[in-house]
From Swiss-Prot:
Motif (Selectivity filter): 131-136
Record Pfam families: IRK, IRK_C
Quaternary structure, from the entry: It forms heteromeric channels with Kir4.1/KCNJ10; this interaction is required for KCNJ16 localization to the basolateral membrane in kidney cells. As a heteromer with KCNJ10, may interact with MAGI1; this interaction may facilitate KCNJ10/KCNJ16 potassium channel expression at the basolateral membrane in kidney cells. May form heteromers with Kir2.1/KCNJ2. Can form heteromeric channels with Kir4.2/KCNJ15.
Gene3D superfamilies associated with the record: 1.10.287.70, G protein-activated inward rectifier potassium channel 1
Keyword Iron-sulfur (UniProt): no
Reported function: Inward rectifier potassium channels are characterized by a greater tendency to allow potassium to flow into the cell rather than out of it. Their voltage dependence is regulated by the concentration of extracellular potassium; as external potassium is raised, the voltage range of the channel opening shifts to more positive voltages. The inward rectification is mainly due to the blockage of outward current by internal magnesium. KCNJ16 may be involved in the regulation of fluid and pH balance.
Protein name per UniProt: Inward rectifier potassium channel 16
Its membrane topology: Multi-pass membrane protein
The family this protein is said to belong to: Belongs to the inward rectifier-type potassium channel (TC 1.A.2.1) family. KCNJ16 subfamily.
Site (Role in the control of polyamine-mediated channel gating and in the blocking by intracellular magnesium): residue numbering on this chain: N161
Source organism (scientific name): Rattus norvegicus
Alphabetically ordered keywords of this record: Cell membrane, Ion channel, Ion transport, Membrane, Phosphoprotein, Potassium, Potassium transport, Transmembrane, Transmembrane helix, Transport, Voltage-gated channel
UniProt intramembrane annotation: 118-134
Name of the gene encoding the protein in the UniProt record: Kcnj16
């Protein structure tokens, strides 16, 4: 069966992930819409012409400095020290100029000893704020203004030091670095799990000190345009089987594609054609600091592999459990019908009706019940497995297969498995 067509192309993923052949990722030729959330969790959003932008940043200057980059933070802190030294140095120089200390008259008691130039005043300001205290320059009791200036500079130096140390510690203890050690699988998978189509991705924590507890959440973001050409974004929560996890070992997050899922009516071809993005978040508490962290990632249709399951990463040893991190991204191709979960449920319903109404079932009923899901997934949807066919409705696309033909198909599969 060929999956090549005029409107699809094979996406090459061999360069970065050699374990995935190119034919496993199918995407549309049209230009893909830019994603809202990058793979590293950063938002692809740019705000322009914000009302009161600088005012809002200056009001919450502490948070602004914590969120800024380290090089910008270093420039701000350096300028705060240098400007404070220059300002108070200028004040001491003006005091000395007004009092006549620059004339070096021995009959005049200076306000600040040994300050006869602006350079000397700047050095005295630096020594005062950093509490160096060389002893060569000192303030006298001749001028109360000079004494008051020294007091103000000492208070301001304590404020600046406290502000800088607090911001630096808060920036080093930020949750962003811890969030970088939480890893999401690059691809999400769609495959059969316990007889149902499921969307799966993997989360792993590769630090020795693991998280205490965590909550996983997933949302499907769908882009659409109205009649006037305006783009709208609609968010739909995905119900997860295991949303509360303890991330001691890598965990596979599972979303069952049922009637409440927004992926319920999408088959393999429709997933490749659709324009959506799955946003996944993991909120957790670290056992080292006890603070809350959040890790984010997203999956677009070209990053969803149909008919795959993840490799096992956990090995049970005699005295411990071994996690093979090399298999974290690995997956193996397994059978999965190309039709949607809605079509699978419709075929199951048709099979149940056949079981109730057909009198010729006889003794084969119990044997068929045990393999009902295999019957539905293999025999009944055999006409749906071509992704190039147009998907209109379950009745139009998946035509009913006669019971005798389906039973013959099951018998042939059973005989081939026993050989």
């Amino acid at each position: 069966m060929s999956y090549y067509g005029s409107s699809y192309r094979i996406v090459n993923v061999d360069s970065k992930y050699p374990g995935y052949p190119p034919e496993h990722a199918i995407a549309e030729k049209r230009r893909a819409r830019r994603r809202l959330l990058h793979k590293d969790g950063s938002c692809n959003v740019y705000f322009k012409h914000i009302f009161g932008e600088w005012g809002s940043y200056m009001v919450d200057i502490f948070t602004t400095l914590v969120d800024t980059k380290w090089r910008h933070m270093f420039v701000v802190f350096s300028l705060s020290y240098i400007l404070s030294w220059l300002i108070f140095g200028s004040i001491f120089w003006l005091i000395a100029l007004h009092h006549g200390d620059l004339l070096s008259d021995p009959d005049i008691t200076p306000c600040v000893d040994n300050v006869h130039s602006f350079t000397a005043a700047f050095l005295f300001s630096l020594e005062t704020q950093t509490t160096i205290g060389y002893g060569y320059r000192c303030v006298t009791e001749e001028c109360s203004v000079a004494v008051l200036t020294v007091i103000l500079q000492s208070i301001l130096s304590c404020i600046i030091n406290t502000f800088i140390i607090g911001a630096a510690l808060a920036k080093m203890a930020t949750a962003r670095k811890r969030a970088q050690t939480i890893r999401f699988s690059y691809f999400a998978l769609i495959g059969m799990r316990d007889g149902k189509l499921c969307l799966m991705w993997r989360i792993g924590d590769f630090r020795p000190n693991h998280v205490v507890e965590g909550t996983v959440r997933a949302q499907l973001l769908r882009y659409s345009e109205d009649s006037e050409g305006r783009m709208t974004m609609a968010f739909k929560d995905l119900k997860l089987v295991n949303d509360q996890i303890i991330l001691v070992t890598p965990v596979t997050i599972v979303h069952e594609i049922d009637h409440e899922s927004p992926l319920y009516a999408l088959d393999r071809k429709a997933v490749a054609k659709d324009n959506f993005e799955i946003l996944v978040t993991f909120i957790y508490t670290g056992d080292s600091t006890g603070t809350s962290h959040q890790s984010r990632s997203s999956y677009v249709p070209r990053e969803i592999l149909w008919g795959h399951r993840f490799h096992d990463v956990l090995e049970v040893k005699r005295k411990y459990y071994k996690v093979n991190c090399l298999q974290f991204e690995g997956s193996v191709e397994v059978y999965a019908p190309f039709c949607s979960a809605k079509q699978l449920d419709w075929k199951d319903q048709q099979l149940n009706n056949l079981e109730k109404t057909s009198p010729a079932r006889g003794s084969c009923t119990s044997d068929t019940n045990t393999r009902r899901r295999s019957f539905s997934a293999v025999a009944m949807v055999s006409s749906c497995e071509n992704p190039e066919e147009t998907s209109l409705s379950p009745q139009d696309e998946c035509k009913e297969v006669p019971y005798q033909k389906a039973l013959l198909t099951l018998n042939r599969i059973s005989m081939e498995s026993q050989m």
